[in-house]
Swiss-Prot record:
NCBIfam families: PRK04301.1, recomb_radA. GO terms for biological process: DNA recombination; DNA repair. This is DNA repair and recombination protein RadA. Pfam families: HHH_5 (PF14520), Rad51 (PF08423).
Length: 330
């Protein structure tokens, strides 16, 4: 890359990195009244608008033409309105941050840990260790970078009432953190329905803007959707709603440089006679929505097996780890 092109790329990237907190009213064509309407619906910053869909904004500002102009202005301000070279994408990916799982073998399987700007799905049966991993990640993100963390806070959305602060304290103590402070660094909310779950994700944006948050956990992403939309007759409506939820999570991860971890339940395939009859719930929506997909399963005693079964660049592979009083360990 020539020095001029490299400088242009650096300027564009710098613009992306320094603009996220610009108030939405800084945008051309957005005055106080429109700004108030956008903020009421969760669009506080230029970056919020840049990652929104035109249809989404049209419902707020009144028509698609004006919404298109506002979205384009936001993307232009962030340098997101044009193509870039693959080399520039590669340079940006070098700046991706990772959170250690606390299990060396699992980190190696994931290429260094859980990535920011991505959605990582963790699927498995009841008792396979999904929630245990979520608890551990909520602690690990708080560690300094030299110890595998990001020196940051976490947001934990609990849909099945499985979050246990006592477990956080155990893991924190084992990792040399003050247990009370570790709990104080986790923003927790219980989601009571799929609508509430989606509202909480919108509210999470405000917390991320105001605090040093680098991890958002949704445990589990599918539970309310399955219980509220039973039967084939409701499947299309469920998947449409789930699709919006997953898209919101992907946008949030990319817009705010946070790691999003979602857990997923499993379902049986009655027509499978050989191999594993179980598959992750959520169908193609979750299959295409998650950036990385992990499958956890039980082995003997307290041993669990983690397999990466879908990734843009990781090869398939599996590793084992143990669940102990101190957390997940090799």
């Amino acid at each position: 890359m020539s020095s001029k092109k490299r400088k242009d790329a650096e300027v564009a990237q710098a613009r992306v990195e320094i603009t996220p907190d610009l108030d939405v009213e800084e945008l051309e064509g957005v005055g106080r009244v429109t700004g108030a309407k956008l903020k009421e619906r969760g669009f506080f910053t230029v970056r919020d608008v840049a990652f929104a869909s035109v249809k989404e904004l049209a419902e707020i500002v009144g028509n698609e033409e004006r919404a298109q102009q506002i979205v384009e202005a936001a993307r232009k301000m962030l340098g997101l309105h044009s193509f870039v070279s693959a080399l520039e994408v590669y340079e940006r990916r070098k700046k991706i941050r990772r959170i250690s799982t606390g299990v060396r073998a699992l980190d190696e399987l994931l290429g260094g840990g859980i990535e920011t700007r991505a959605v990582t799905e963790v699927a498995g049966e009841f008792g396979s260790g999904k929630t245990q991993l979520c608890h551990q990640l909520a602690v690990m993100v708080q560690l300094p970078e030299e110890r595998g963390g990001l020196g940051a806070k976490a947001i934990y959305i609990d849909t099945e009432n499985t979050f246990r602060p006592e477990r956080i304290m155990q893991i924190a103590k084992a990792r040399g953190l003050d247990p009370d402070q570790a709990l104080n660094n986790i923003f927790y909310a219980r989601a009571y329905s799929s609508d509430h779950q989606m509202i909480l994700v919108d509210q999470a944006k405000s917390i991320i803007r105001q605090h040093n948050v680098a991890l958002l956990i949704v445990d589990s992403v599918i539970a309310h959707f399955r219980s509220e939309f039973p039967g084939r007759e409701n499947l299309a409506e469920r998947q449409q709603k789930l699709n919006k939820h997953v898209a919101d999570l992907l946008r949030l991860a990319d817009a705010y440089d946070v790691a999003v971890v979602i857990t997923n339940q499993v379902m049986a395939q009655p027509d499978v006679f050989f191999g594993n009859p179980l598959r992750p719930a959520g169908g193609n929506i979750l299959a295409h929505g998650a950036t990385y997909r992990l499958w956890l399963r039980k082995s003997k005693e307290n041993i669990r097996i983690a397999k990466i079964f879908d990734s843009p660049y990781h090869p398939e592979g599996e590793v084992s780890f143990r669940i102990t009083e101190e957390g997940l360990v090799d």
